[in-house]
Amino acid sequence: MSITFNAIDHSYDSINTEGIDWISVTTLVSYFKKPFDAKKVAEKVSKNKKSKWYGILPDEIQNIWNAESTRATTLGTYYHNQRESDLCALASIEREGFTIPIFSPLPEKDGIKYASIQKLEPGVYPEHMVYLKSVGICGQSDLVEIVNGKVNIIDYKTNKEIKTESYTDWEGKSDKLSPPLDNLDDCNFNHYALQLSIYMYIILKHNPKLKPGKIFIHHISFEQEDVDKWGYPIAKLNYNNEPIVKEVIPIAVPYLVDEVISIMHYLHDNKHKVKKK
């Protein structure tokens, strides 16, 4: 069995006729986050005299936010593609004292990516697609390493910042993810930790002889030429008109296996709710 990924609409589908209604890991994690009502927030900040958005039409504010989101996504896509290209140009690489092969993802056909075999041997797997048929979830890990009997996962993030705590109100109450994850702050570090932990869980399900290794976020920042009138960065470009990487900061991420198991149980009984949302 295998699945495909359509990069245009970010959808997953089965190659065969099993008709599984797939849910992406990012969609699954987002289900437990506090919803962000962009329209409502834009209307609120446009009326706040202390806000930089004061006096600006809410629709214009949302357009500015969307443009910034597109800018950040474009940078992220550039870095992902560059890393994949660099790694796939090599036959092997040294990791933890071992020389291991690099397995390129299957070639795209008409914009469609195909999942490779889920049973993994020692090596490096850029842009590795994972799926778990029993619960109908799938996703794509930026980098998976199988070395010395362990699974290492690395994910590239180009966000402005990685927040390890959520918003706390004047009473000292912080925003939490919804049950059964209400022990975790609703912040992007925990969102990513859950995402990568689910990838780890799926890989180990297909490869029970392997053990969990290290999980890292590589937080990427780029050289800035300037900032725009709203304070958003303008990337500095090299002679090839490409953004210049300033720094790559590795951030260790815990394997949240207990939380992942809770998600699997929840999904088994509530998949229709997750899809509906």
Question: What do the predicted segments below correspond to?
Answer:
Residues 1-138:
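Metal-dependent nuclease catalytic cores that hydrolyze phosphodiester bonds in DNA/RNA
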Residues 185-193, 197-277:
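Metal-dependent nuclease catalytic regions and adjoining charged, substrate-binding loops involved
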Residues 131, 144-146, 218-220:
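A generic structural motif
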Residues 80, 139-165, 172-178, 199:
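Conserved catalytic cores of phosphodiester-cleaving nucleases, focusing on short active-site segments
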Residues 125, 152-156, 214-219:
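A structural signal for short, well-ordered beta-strand segments and their strand-loop junctions
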Residues 72, 76, 162-165, 192-196:
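Short alpha-helical patches at coil-to-helix transitions and adjacent helical residues
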Residues 131, 159-161, 206, 222-223:
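Short, solvent-exposed loop/turn segments at secondary-structure junctions
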Residues 68, 177-189:
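Short histidine-centered catalytic/ligand-binding loop motif
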